[in-house]
Swiss-Prot record:
Function (record text): Sesquiterpene synthase involved in the biosynthesis of bisabolene.
GO biological process, one term: diterpenoid biosynthetic process
Protein name from the UniProt record: (S)-beta-bisabolene synthase
Binding site for Mg(2+) 1: D303, D307
The protein's required cofactors: Mg(2+); Mn(2+)
Residues the record lists as binding Mg(2+) 3: S451, E455
Family: Belongs to the terpene synthase family. Tpsa subfamily.
Origin species: Zingiber officinale (Ginger)
Length: 550
């Protein structure tokens, strides 16, 4: 997909340029993750975890009853342990999909629906019709069933565009759970509060797990074996993540980009790693995390260069050099970009060196997406300098690329296992399927809304909010409300696509879904990537600094 043809370019000549440099906060972390590695005895944790995993496998063999099976699966998933028990869960769900739930209550029916929808089973939402009265409203007697309401609330977020009953369920359950919250006892009240802020379907698993462990340990019906395993597993993964982050921080320091000394780039290497880690935290995705983190930091440098520093002519020169992908192009660039350009080429070569011979084709896709990314940034520079405010549709065609999700997804996929990152997977991704477009839409709009106030302080390209306001003559608040409606539609598209058979590994499809979930992590109420001393810092402390007491 080509976004703009860059014309032939003249050699850059140094001139005095008056630049509007964005003032970004410096890195909070510095060398913390290089110099402050906390030693946890991993040997005993691994040994004990294996014992506990065997005990949990026995639970799957010995569990009796539909409700007990569903609760076991749900608990394991919410505690982030499901990657250890994929076969057991798949076998149990294959049995559950054929169970007649007509004689069960709201809690059980909604849990059954959610567990199956989460794994791609297209169970009908008609199962909830029996909970409506003659007027088509949810029954009054459900209003005091907090457990059933919460179960329905979380299930309803797996709805598609045609399932209006689930839209009604969200409104009904949210209103009533909010009313009941003050009268609920902990730890259930904490769980309700947590999921009212972000439903399970949109929660980053690693972040939710950290919170849920604290809730689950106070449950009167907790399983001590599962709880101990959850704590051990969290801490063992944290040890792995700390080691990876130490490597990443050392790599970033050694890279020593000249451009960083100009102080217009967001130094967010720790935040970049955390972004990648919350998408897929399992040991099997270590290489993907390392590659995607490095790529995300390069994207940040590229984005800030176009957006916050380079002139239009300099942007054109950089874009043209990237399209040619030749180190000889460095002489055409202004001095401050030369070091970055050459190191960028070297890093892509390092990515290729990380891959086995049969995997190296992936970098061809990655380079192509990088070129497209630079074209999108350049086009935005043109819009900015021309004070051009396009119609929303035109803006979205460009900005769902410039937001960087497509490139980032390609980078993460490039580092995944051979059975997942097949040639077919890359061809599917390159076709820009509906789920990729929907994920990019969510990230684009939430990014624009949370960064809107900061962007107004300097010359900037029109955002989706600006475009909507101009096209429809609305206020900022109305524009944001309407755009968030598009976000809700995009989530429903994702849900539909997760129920569609593609012939690819489900991990390929879910990777895009997990990437969209990061909006709750990065763009919930503020642009936490640009302003990291907010929720981002809190999450990094809880996920990467503080282990869970055992």
């Amino acid at each position: 997909m080509e976004l703009v043809d860059t014309p032939s370019l003249e050699v850059f000549e140094d001139v005095v340029v008056d630049r509007q440099v964005a003032g970004f906060d410096p890195s909070f972390w510095g060398d913390y993750f290089i110099t402050n590695q906390k030693s946890q005895s991993e040997a005993w944790m691994n040994e004990r975890a294996e014992e506990l995993k065997n005990e949990v496998r026995s639970m799957f063999q010995n569990v009796t009853g539909i409700l007990q099976t569903m609760n076991l699966i749900d608990t394991i998933q919410l505690l982030g342990l499901d990657y250890h028990f994929m076969e057991e869960i798949a076998k149990a769900l294959d049995h559950l999909k054929d169970v007649d739930m007509s004689k069960y209550g709201l809690y059980e029916v909604a849990l059954h629906f959610r567990l199956l929808r989460q794994k791609g089973f297209n169970i009908s939402s008609d199962v909830f019709k029996k909970y409506k009265d003659k007027e088509g409203k949810f029954m009054e007697e459900l209003k005091d069933d907090a457990k059933g309401l919460l179960s329905l609330y979380n299930a309803a977020y797996f709805g598609t565009k045609e399932e209006t009953i689930l839209d009604e369920a969200i409104s009904f359950t949210k209103d009533n759970l909010t009313s009941l919250l003050k009268d609920l006892n902990p730890p259930f009240a904490k769980l309700v509060s947590l999921t009212l802020k972000t439903p399970i379907q949109r929660s980053m698993k690693r972040i939710f797990t950290r919170s849920y462990i604290s809730i689950y340990q106070d449950e009167p019906t907790l399983n001590e074996t599962i709880l101990e395993l959850a704590k051990l597993d969290f801490n063992m993964l944290q040890c792995l993540h700390q080691k990876e982050l130490k490597k990443i921080c050392a790599w970033w320091n050694n890279l020593n980009l000249d451009i960083m000394h100009l102080n217009f780039i967001r130094d967010r290497v720790v935040e970049c790693y955390c972004w990648s880690m919350v998408i897929r935290h399992e040991p099997s995705c270590s290489r993907a995390r390392l590659i995607s983190t490095k790529l995300l930091m390069l994207i940040t440098v590229l984005d800030d260069t176009y957006d916050s520093y380079s002139t239009l002519e300099e942007s054109r020169l950089l874009t043209d050099a990237i399209q040619r992908w030749n180190p000889n192009e460095v002489d055409q660039l202004p001095e401050y970009l030369r070091d970055f350009f050459l190191k960028m080429l070297n890093i892509f070569q390092e990515f290729e060196n990380e891959l086995a011979p049969e995997e190296k084709f992936r970098i061809l896709y990655l380079k192509e997406e990088w070129k497209i990314q630079s074209q999108s940034y350049f086009k935005e520079c043109q819009w900015r300098d021309d004070n051009y405010v396009p119609k929303l549709e035109e803006h979205m065609r460009l900005s769902i690329i410039s937001v960087g999700f497509v490139l980032f997804y390609c980078g993460f996929l490039s580092g995944m296992e051979e059975a997942v990152a097949t040639k077919d997977a890359f061809e599917w991704f390159a076709s820009f399927p509906k789920i990729i477009e929907a994920c990019a839409t969510i990230i684009r709009i939430t990014n624009d809304i949370t960064s809107m106030e900061r962007e107004q302080k300097r010359a900037h390209v029109a955002s989706t909010v600006d475009c909507y306001m101009k096209e429809y003559g609305t206020s900022k608040d109305v524009a944001c409300e309407k755009l968030l409606g598009f976000v809700e539609d995009a989530w429903k598209t994702i849900n539909e696509e997760l129920l569609t058979e593609t012939g690819l590994s489900r991990e390929v499809i879910e990777l895009s879904f997990h990437s969209a979930q990061t909006t709750e992590f990065v763009y919930k109420h503020v642009d936490a990537f640009t302003e990291p001393n907010t929720t981002m810092k809190e999450n990094i402390f809880s996920l990467l600094v503080h282990p869970i007491p055992i």
